Amino acid sequence: MPTLTDSPPTTVLTVTELQQLLPHRYPFLLVDRIIDYVPEKYAVGLKNVTINEPFFQGHFPGRPIMPGVLIVEALAQVGGVVLMQMNWAKDKLSVFAGIDKVRFRRPVVPGDQLILRAELLVVKQQRIGKMQGRAEVNGQLVCEGEMMFSLVD
């Protein structure tokens, strides 16, 4: 995954292109762009975390920390990019079916740049599946876990 010592990340998909793939919109679109993508395998997204995020108003005043559930949601949105580019999934909605083995390793605060990787592990009957998610800031692990999804018509 890219770190600060690497050259600036390239853009594979812009936020406008993301909005064509995902149903999420402000304030719940939690990915700014996709910086790496291998069809039907994985995607890597980027989220610039700013003090202007609406969730910082209450989480926590005077000590803003990005809620862990929103880090997991951002990972799931990157996973949605992988799914929504598969021909059989294009007209479906991907929803959470569960999460397993999720661990949070350090807080995410304003000014951080989240690098979010979602790797497709398995799909069954073109309906349900599992992804591995990993989020980093400056090369340090922030969050990791498995995400299960279901595709609905």
Swiss-Prot record:
UniProt enzyme class: lyase
Keywords attached to this entry? Cytoplasm, Lipid A biosynthesis, Lipid biosynthesis, Lipid metabolism, Lyase
Give the chief site where it resides: cytoplasm
A GO cellular component annotated for this chain's UniProt record is:
cytoplasm
Q: Could you tell me which HAMAP family the record lists for this protein?
A: FabZ
Similarity section: Belongs to the thioester dehydratase family. FabZ subfamily.
Q: What is this protein called?
A: 3-hydroxyacyl-[acyl-carrier-protein] dehydratase FabZ
Q: What is the lineage of its organism?
A: Bacteria, Bacillati, Cyanobacteriota, Cyanophyceae, Acaryochloridales
